[in-house]
Amino acid sequence: MKIKALSKLKPEEGIWMTEVEKPEMGHNDILIRIKKTAICGTDVHIYNWDEWSQKTIPVPMVVGHEYVGEVVGIGQEVRGFEIGDRVSGEGHITCGHCRNCRGGRTHLCRNTTGVGVNRTGAFSEFLVIPAFNAFKIPAGISDDLASIFDPFGNAVHTALSFDLVGEDVLITGAGPIGIMAAAVAKHVGARHVVITDVNEFRLDLARKMGVTRAVNVMNEKLEDVMSDLGMTEGFDVGLEMSGNPSAFNSMLTNMNHGGKISLLGIPPSDMAVDWNQVIFKGLVIKGIYGREMFETWYKMASLIQSGLDLTPIITHHYKIDDFQAGFDMMRSGMSGKVILDWE
């Protein structure tokens, strides 16, 4: 049976609507009928066919890894799922036999493959994943929100890596993940949450999500903002989401002694770092990859159930046949999350 899917067909800019064979299920898998997908920054990299994509993405391949759908098939060894369950899923498929997997640190598996990155993705009418990777969506959480659980998980993992209660938090990079991380920090009890960027549309989005200050570093100095807020000692926690060298070095300059930094943004390989700031301030820097399985997923659902409102981050919806308009919107930088509807 042929199904519709968005694929990377050629090693050049673009993504194409194609027909592919319906995926087949193994004993430990589930088959998901896709309802909604969201476009990730990674999908934009793949669309643009940048240096990272050229090294990473096999062609041709169905792409996409942010989704919600309904279980329509269950492998014979699978327990705990029923036909009709609403699910999203962890996009990192892990090996199960390395030291970290066997030690319960699955997100650090050295043999990880990625849905829509180096194995068949979710921009399709149907997706097969190991049942281990599926996450049931609690009642009361909308399909729209469930479809962005993957990037929301990046935000939660980054934000909750350090204690935030009563702390002053600096977030560099107001993309969707940075904005969601800011909302999480506020929700769990941080004092001042300051986010920086140069994109005024996204800074406005961050203001809607409740940050203390959204700072356009083209027109405003971070030091002046800290002074306005009565901060005399620097930020306690930094969340670096941009991969921008000047943003990271500005973060180092403005951290308090003993401050802690989570790094999610991917910098250029030749980024210069003022290590004196790190050493003499006694800073702790932690690299963040993916989501903790499945602690981050439980936290994500619980945060929404306890009143965290992420709805402003979803700014655009398109029918799947209008996928090109969705990608154009994401590439423009004038959007939050963009959702493609498959039904």
Curated annotation (Swiss-Prot):
Give the SMART domains listed for this entry.
Answer: PKS_ER
The record's listing under PROSITE patterns reads: ADH_ZINC
Query: Which residues of this UniProt protein bind Zn(2+) 2?
Result: 95, 98, 101, 109
Q: Which residues bind Zn(2+) 1?
A: 40, 65-66
> What name does the UniProt record give this protein?
L-threonine 3-dehydrogenase
Quote the pathway field.
Amino-acid degradation; L-threonine degradation via oxydo-reductase pathway; glycine from L-threonine: step 1/2
Q: Name one GO cellular component term.
A: cytoplasm
Q: Which gene encodes it?
A: tdh
One GO MF term on file is: zinc ion binding
Keyword field contains Cytoplasm? yes
Q: Identify which top EC class this enzyme belongs to.
A: oxidoreductase
Q: How is the cofactor bound?
A: Binds 2 Zn(2+) ions per subunit.
Instruction: Provide the E.C. number(s) assigned to this enzyme.
Output: 1.1.1.103
Q: Specify where it is mainly localized.
A: cytoplasm
Task: Give cofactor(s), names only.
Answer: Zn(2+)
| Similarity comment | Belongs to the zinc-containing alcohol dehydrogenase family.
Q: Does Transcription regulation show up as a keyword for this record? A: no
| One record GO biological process | L-threonine catabolic process to glycine
Functional description taken from the UniProt entry: Catalyzes the NAD(+)-dependent oxidation of L-threonine to 2-amino-3-ketobutyrate.
| Subunit field text | Homotetramer.
Cite the binding residues for NAD(+): 177, 197, 202, 264-266, 288-289
Show the catalytic activity: L-threonine + NAD(+) = (2S)-2-amino-3-oxobutanoate + NADH + H(+)
Where in the chain are disulfide-linked cysteines found? none
